[in-house]
Every structure is written in structure tokens, then in C-alpha cells.
Design a protein with these regions (language model features):
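DUTPase catalytic domain/fold
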Residues: 1-143
């Protein structure tokens, strides 16, 4: 099991918890109360800085209930936090766009992350044909 260093920006932040067997994703919460109006953009502080192990990155995504509960969208789809973002002041944040007026309470679980190994080194080879069947285009299962 890997040990990950986490700096909390407040003593009353709920500590991160990995629940084996339940999900590979770890919830993150708003570090402060945030009030947004429809059309607002804001970087919501998540109250943690994390020293990822070398060779790893984190993928940050909204929880499935985030839009239903708060009407916010994560503006960069899935956020990617790389290994080098590990300083004492490198607090993780969730970039959001508000679709309606909302107040997100401090401690509300709004997003989740997982840690994944970096992509291996790749080399691309130019070819005239790939050799596989066409599936029918973008958005098609090929059926």
C-alpha cells in the first residue's frame, strides 16, 4: 500500500479516506462556503495539497450528485493533477461554472479523485492502413 503525504489547509477539514473495495475514487469537499450566481465561474478550494508519488498523476472529476445537488459543472471536464504540483501552497481546486444560484456549504463533497500511473513512453508509427474494421464513426458502437 502506498503512503501519500497530504497537507490540510484547515484543522477542521475532514481527512481523506480510501475505502478499499467500495470505490477507487476518493471524495473531496469544499474547503469554504461558496456562493455562486448563475453564470459565475470560480475555483473552489478543496483544502488539500497532495504530494503524489513520482510517476503518478491524479484525475479529478465531479461526484455523480454534484450537478443535481448544486447545479455546477466542472469546466475542464476531468482535471489532471501532475506529480510536480506538490508544493506547500499548491492547494487543489475545482474549477466550476454555476448553472443556477447556489450556496455550497463548507464540507460538501463536490468532487472525487483517483491516482493513476503515468502513461508510458510512446512512439508513433505512420502507416497507410491500421488493419482493423471500421466501426461506423464517432458515437457508434459499430452495430
Amino acid at each position: 500500500m502506498e503512503t501519500i503525504k497530504v497537507k490540510y489547509f484547515s484543522d477542521d477539514m475532514e481527512e481523506l479516506c480510501y475505502v478499499a473495495g467500495k470505490s477507487d475514487w476518493i471524495d473531496l469537499s469544499a474547503a469554504e462556503e461558496v456562493t455562486l450566481h448563475a453564470g459565475d465561474f470560480q475555483l473552489i478550494p478543496l483544502g488539500v495539497a497532495i504530494a503524489l508519488p513520482e510517476g503518478y498523476e491524479a484525475h479529478l472529476a465531479p461526484r455523480s450528485s454534484t450537478f443535481k445537488n448544486f447545479g455546477i459543472l466542472q469546466t475542464n471536464s476531468v482535471g489532471v493533477v501532475d506529480y510536480s504540483y506538490r508544493g506547500d501552497g499548491d492547494q487543489w481546486r475545482m474549477p466550476v461554472y454555476a448553472m443556477r444560484d447556489v450556496t455550497i456549504p463548507k464540507g460538501a463533497r463536490i468532487c472525487q479523485f483517483r491516482i493513476v500511473e503515468n502513461q508510458p513512453a510512446l512512439q508513433f508509427l505512420k502507416v497507410e492502413t491500421l488493419g482493423g474494421p471500421d466501426r461506423g464513426g464517432f458515437g457508434s458502437t459499430g452495430i
